[in-house]
């Protein structure tokens, strides 16, 4: 499995991300051609790279020269521009996710509907180039999972189209929900909205660099040269091959203290029938020592709102919490096997030195009922014969 780890010790911005990926070995033509697919006048901008250094460390810079004044753009304009382009589906999907997270954050900060969000700096050609360029570079590398370290907040103020705002800018702060941060990097803006959106949209998890075999390192330089540390985003490319499968999920939780067990059982069945990957109840004590249950539902990211609405509709909960999570799974497939009890479906599970079979519950129940055998005995026979 190919992964990227973003070492954001000095922060992250859109241009630093593209620069680090170019430094990692992505051909400049990949980024240039991807941006060239969009409905942007080619005379209005030019792209370039250059070698530079920050505190003695050599790095790549990605530079967008804008020749003309660029209009403000609504979120819908940018989404349509990407969707109607001839970009590969993988690039479109990544770029759309990033811009959606940006628009979502801007809408919340400014109290407007998603469709009315104006992108000022973000809508300019340089930021569109950063996002589409990053999506194209990641797609070219064939990356299957992205991880990142804690992000430095920075301090002070930054000048924006909305005036002088505190660091991190409000949209950046909104995008940092669920992402570990720290305040050790020094003054100035260390994380831009575009940089935060890239990680918020694409990263499967955050924390120390995971165990992997490093296959490449790229360093992308920021525009400014900080006095305290090198203004560089460092990206590690690596391989993980432990027989695991990885994907991204969303965990939805609700605390419920006044719904009957019968209703709760029904809600679990509804969640699973609606496509939830897992659902569980656990006991807890709430305020005033009231006994209650925590409903935990694991879903694919695109199912989040549907399942959250189901929980709010079917229970007495007045709110739910959710957070993104990475999932690590052993490989599995379902096979039919011949046994002395007849044909039985089993899950064949393997990976990272693990190899076992798990009989399908429904098939074992059917055999136990047909033959008048204890269910445990059916399980033992199937496991013994199919595990050989």
Swiss-Prot record:
SS bonds (residue pairs): none
Sample GO molecular function, one term: nickel cation binding
A Pfam cross-reference name: Ni_insertion
Keywords: Nickel
Official protein name in the record: Putative nickel insertion protein
Homology family: Belongs to the LarC family.
């Amino acid at each position: 499995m190919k992964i990227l780890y973003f070492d954001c010790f000095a922060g992250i911005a859109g241009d630093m991300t593209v620069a680090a990926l170019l430094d990692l070995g992505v051909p400049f033509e990949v980024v240039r051609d991807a941006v060239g697919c969009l409905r942007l006048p080619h005379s209005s901008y030019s792209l370039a790279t250059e070698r530079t250094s920050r505190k003695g460390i050599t790095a790549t810079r990605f530079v967008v020269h804008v020749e003309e004044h660029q209009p403000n753009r609504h979120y819908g304009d940018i989404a349509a521009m990407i969707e109607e382009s001839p970009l590969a589906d993988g690039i479109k999907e990544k770029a759309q996710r990033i811009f959606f997270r940006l628009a979502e954050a801007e809408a919340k900060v400014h109290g407007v509907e998603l469709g009315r969000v104006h992108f000022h700096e973000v809508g300019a050609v340089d930021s569109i180039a950063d996002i589409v360029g990053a999506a194209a570079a990641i797609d070219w590398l064939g990356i299957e999972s992205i991880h990142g370290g804690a992000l430095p907040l920075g301090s002070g103020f930054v000048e924006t189209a909305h005036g002088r705002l505190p660091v991190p800018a409000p949209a950046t702060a909104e995008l940092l929900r669920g992402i570990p941060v720290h305040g050790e990097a020094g003054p100035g803006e260390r994380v831009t909205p575009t940089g935060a959106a890239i990680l918020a949209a694409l990263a499967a998890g955050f924390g120390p660099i995971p165990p992997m075999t490093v296959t490449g390192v790229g360093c992308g330089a920021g525009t400014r040269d900080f006095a305290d540390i090198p203004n560089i985003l460092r990206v590690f490319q690596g391989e993980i091959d432990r027989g695991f499968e990885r994907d991204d999920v969303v965990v939805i939780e609700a605390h419920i203290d006044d719904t009957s067990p019968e209703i709760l059982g029904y809600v679990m069945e509804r969640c699973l029938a609606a496509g939830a990957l897992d659902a569980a109840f656990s006991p807890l004590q709430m305020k005033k020592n009231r006994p209650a249950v925590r409903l935990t539902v694991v879903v694919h990211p695109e199912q989040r709102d549907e399942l959250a609405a189901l929980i709010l509709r079917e229970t007495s909960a007045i709110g739910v919490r959710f957070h993104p999570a990475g999932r690590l799974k052993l490989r599995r497939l379902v096979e039919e096997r011949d046994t002395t009890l007849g044909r039985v479906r089993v899950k064949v599970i393997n990976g990272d030195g693990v190899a076992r079979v798990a009989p399908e519950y429904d098939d074992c129940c059917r055999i136990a009922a047909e033959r008048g055998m204890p269910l445990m005995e059916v399980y033992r026979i199937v496991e013994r014969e199919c595990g050989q």
